[in-house]
Amino acid sequence: MAGSHPYFNLPDSTHPSPPSAPPSLRWHQRCQPSGATNGLLVALLGGGLPAGFVGPLSRMAYQGSNLPSLELLICRCLFHLPIALLLKLRGDPLLGPPDIRGWACFCALLNVLSIGCAYSAVQVVPAGNAATVRKGSSTVCSAVLTLCLESQGLGGYEWCGLLGSILGLIIILGPGLWTLQEGTTGVYTTLGYVQAFLGGLALSLGLLVYRSLHFPSCLPTVAFLSGLVGLLGCVPGLFVLQTPVLPSDLLSWSCVGAEGILALVSFTCVGYAVTKAHPALVCAVLHSEVVVALILQYYMLHETVALSDIMGAGVVLGSIAIITARNLSCERTGKVEE
């Protein structure tokens, strides 16, 4: 037959053959977590979990050596100063570019105010409750401010997870607010909750300002400025407002050191996460700090954890699971190994 002749078996240039299908990609090449998912996972594992240890460790240092919040804040700021070596090695200015130096310092000031309010609150209210109020206020304020200033909305699943996490915080906090003691103790407790709320507000503002900064080495610059601004503001007050106090035993020194390291890790991870995902979602995922703080409050500080705390923690974890699962999207790389 003519079709069997080699001549007729040559490829026809007038009818190009369909493109060959690309070779099958491996799973890790076909799918990879999106940027938002990476940010949320970093916020969960590197931001929320280490931060959950900060409050109980600070409470232990206060109980062991009567270490005030001002000294705790100064010790934490000291851990930020070695970042100057990294900036020097990279040849970057320590205070950031001159045109946005003021905003970088303002962001650092907001971070210091947030941390200071958190340390003051944790000394008069349970660590879990202080973390609950701070994270709840930061989540709500981040959602409102981002929607108003950046016009960046959320999807249905995100709102469901966000509102669910806030509901969990209300379940944790509600019974405690109804049983506030009267008199001086009740006033100090109320002020502690107010400080925790203001700390969350300052945190949300700091995250929004940080998102607006775009220059190389933004994260290490803001981290160094936070330590510098904190020291410049706290060291004079250390000698004016009170008598300086140092940790009196090895346990207190260990708590201060561990708290400073874990806080720096959490600060760095949150700074990375907020550039990848919505600030409100990052703050919602950081509610894992509350769950960790409640666990440590029971096992380390031997403070009572009510049934409402356990129920609220379960709601928070479920909401975090919804947010994380919604953002666990797979993106095709579109690249084929040669």
From Swiss-Prot:
Instruction: List the InterPro entries hit by this protein, alphabetically.
Output: EamA_dom (IPR000620)
Where does the record place the region Disordered? 1-27
SUPFAM superfamilies named among the record's database cross-references: Multidrug resistance efflux transporter EmrE
User: In what tissue types does this protein appear?
Assistant: Expressed in placenta and testis.
Where is this protein found? Answer: Membrane
The record gives the membrane topology as: Multi-pass membrane protein
N-terminal signal peptide: none
Q: Which residues cross the membrane?
A: 37-57, 67-87, 102-122, 160-180, 190-210, 221-241, 250-270, 281-301, 305-325
**GO CC list:** membrane
Family according to the record? Belongs to the SLC35G solute transporter family.
The protein depicted here goes by the name Solute carrier family 35 member G5
